[in-house]
Amino acid sequence: APYWYYLCDKYGIYLEDEANIESHEYYYGKQSLSHVPEFRNAHIARNMEMVHATVNHPSVVIWSLGNEAGPGKTFVDCYNAIKAYDTSRPVQYERNNDIVDMGSNQYPSIAWVQGAVQGKYKLKYPFHISEYAHSMGNACGNLIDYWDAIESTNFFMGGAIWDWVDQALDKQDPATGKTYWAYGGDFGKDNKPNDGMFCMNGIMRPDLTPKAQYFEVKKVYQNVGVKAIDMKQGQIEIFNKNYFEPLKNYQIVWSLYKDGVCVKKNQPLQGAKNIVGPREKGIYTLPYDYAS
C-alpha cells in the first residue's frame, strides 16, 4: 500500500521491494515458467512496473525479482532491465545468487547459519535469508538462536519472516450466530470442507491484533540487546544494534529479583547512554552488593 511506503520513508525503515511473481507449483524444474519464452515479457513487465512505481522512495534499498519462480534465463533479462533503468540499488532473487548482486537462501537450519557467519561456506555478500521462521501455529520459538548467530557479524543481513498477517475473513456461523476467522474449506467449492490453512502464517491475526509470535519477534528484533556475562559479579553486556544512532535517547534501568521478589527496582545504569555507539558492545557492572 502507498501509505506503507510513506511510513518507511518517514521512519527510516529499509524496504526490499519484490516483484509480484511467484509460480510456486512449477518451482525449479524444467517446467518452470522462467524457461518459457511466452512468459518472458510478462516477467519483465511486472519487475519494471514495480520499479517505476517505487523508484523515488528512499526507503526502497533492494529490488527483488520475485519469489520461488524458477531459475530460467528470463530472470537474467529481468535483472538487466532493472539495471538499465536503475543502477543505484542492488538486486536479489532467492537462491539464484549467480545472476544477482547479493546472496540469499530460504529456510536454512540454525546450524547452517551458525556455520555461515563463521565463513564456512562460499557465499555472495551481502547475504540475507529471503524467507525463514514460518509463522504457522506455535512458531518462532527458536528465533533467538538464529539471531544470536546473525548478530555475531556485520555482513549477515538477517532475514524475512513468512509472514506478517493471517489471511482470513470474518464470517458468521449461521447455526450459532458466532463469528470466526474463515479460511480454506470454509469457502470450499460445492460446500466441501477441508482443513487447508496455508494462508494462516502471520505473526498478526487478520484484524492486526498480535499473536504470541509477535511478542517473540519484537523482543528478538529490539534495537538494544542485553546479555548476562557474569551475574555473580553483576556483569552484563549491552549491544547497540542501531547502525547510526548512539544510545543517548534511551533510558536504561535495571531491576534485581531474588526468588521472584524484587529487591532493587528501576535502578539507572549510568554511562551506557554515552558510551555505546552504533553497532558497539559494552560490559557494565550493576552496582549491588551481591554478597549480602
Located regions from the model:
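Substrate-binding/catalytic cleft of secreted carbohydrate-active enzymes
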Residues: 1-200
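Carbohydrate-binding surfaces of carbohydrate-active enzymes
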Residues: 149-292
